[in-house]
Structures are given as structure tokens and as C-alpha cells.
């Protein structure tokens, strides 16, 4: 989907994420970012791979979420780099990936709830259909660039 490997975000989003990282670090975790800013061309490619509006924003509806540079897909890892147990793997396009958590192990649900609590405290809102997806509550203008 991407022609680059680095994660790009708005400066204000990065500042909020740094506060969240400090909170997680105090609990023994680091943030692992899977996805961040997404150029519009990449959004179009992703839609071709998964044309399901529950999981991928339809590019015909304009620039949304990842295209604005204020949304991240993330998880937590321990200090030695092991991913913390969460409800599903990344980009699991099933109902188990939503924020209901009634159909996943309690440890995974507790970890996801803890991550959501910290991210909310730091100015993010989670997408209901994906436990890993967080958007900055600050609204940003659309931007489209190829890193």
C-alpha cells in the first residue's frame, strides 16, 4: 500500500502521543505504531484490497481519518519488544476487533480498555470497529503529500 516506511503525523498529534507514551512507559509499555498518515493514493489502493466501509474508508467520500495525519493504528509492547495481548491481531477484519470486548479473553479486553483509557486522557478517540485505531480529537485540514 505504501511506498515509504516511516510514520507521519501532525505535530499536535505527535505531542499528544508523546504524553501517552510517558504514561504507558510508567506502566512498563511502549507504543508500537502500525499505521499513521496515509496518502490519498494509498487509501485508494487499500479500498481496492478491502472495499468494506466498516474497515476501510471509501475514498469516493473524500479524505478521512488517516488521510488527515491525526490517526494512528497502534498497540503496546513490553520493554523487550513483545506485543501485549490484545483482542485480535492488527487489521483483523472481524467483529472480535471491535470495542465490545465481550467475545475475547479478559486479559486482552483489559489491556485494550487500559490503552483506550490512556489514549482518551491524552486527547484521542477510538474508532468503534477497531481496537487499535485512535484519532486526535483536534480537527485538521486535509493534506495530501507523498513522503
Where are these regions (language model features)?
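Cell-envelope/glycan interface and biosynthesis
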Residues: 1-147
Amino acid at each position: 500500500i505504501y511506498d515509504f516506511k516511516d510514520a507521519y503525523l501532525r505535530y499536535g498529534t505527535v505531542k499528544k502521543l508523546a504524553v501517552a507514551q510517558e504514561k504507558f512507559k510508567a506502566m512498563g509499555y511502549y507504543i508500537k505504531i502500525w499505521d499513521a498518515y496515509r496518502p490519498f493514493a494509498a487509501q485508494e489502493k487499500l479500498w481496492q484490497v478491502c472495499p468494506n466501509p466498516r474497515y476501510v474508508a471509501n475514498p469516493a467520500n473524500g479524505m478521512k481519518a488517516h488521510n488527515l495525519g491525526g490517526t494512528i493504528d497502534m498497540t503496546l509492547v513490553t520493554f523487550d519488544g513483545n506485543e501485549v495481548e490484545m483482542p485480535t491481531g492488527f487489521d483483523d477484519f472481524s467483529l472480535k476487533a471491535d470495542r465490545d470486548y465481550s467475545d475475547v479473553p479478559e486479559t486482552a479486553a483489559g489491556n485494550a480498555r487500559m490503552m483506550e483509557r490512556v489514549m482518551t486522557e491524552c486527547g484521542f478517540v477510538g474508532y468503534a470497529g477497531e481496537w487499535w485505531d485512535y484519532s486526535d480529537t483536534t480537527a485538521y485540514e486535509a493534506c495530501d503529500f507523498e513522503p
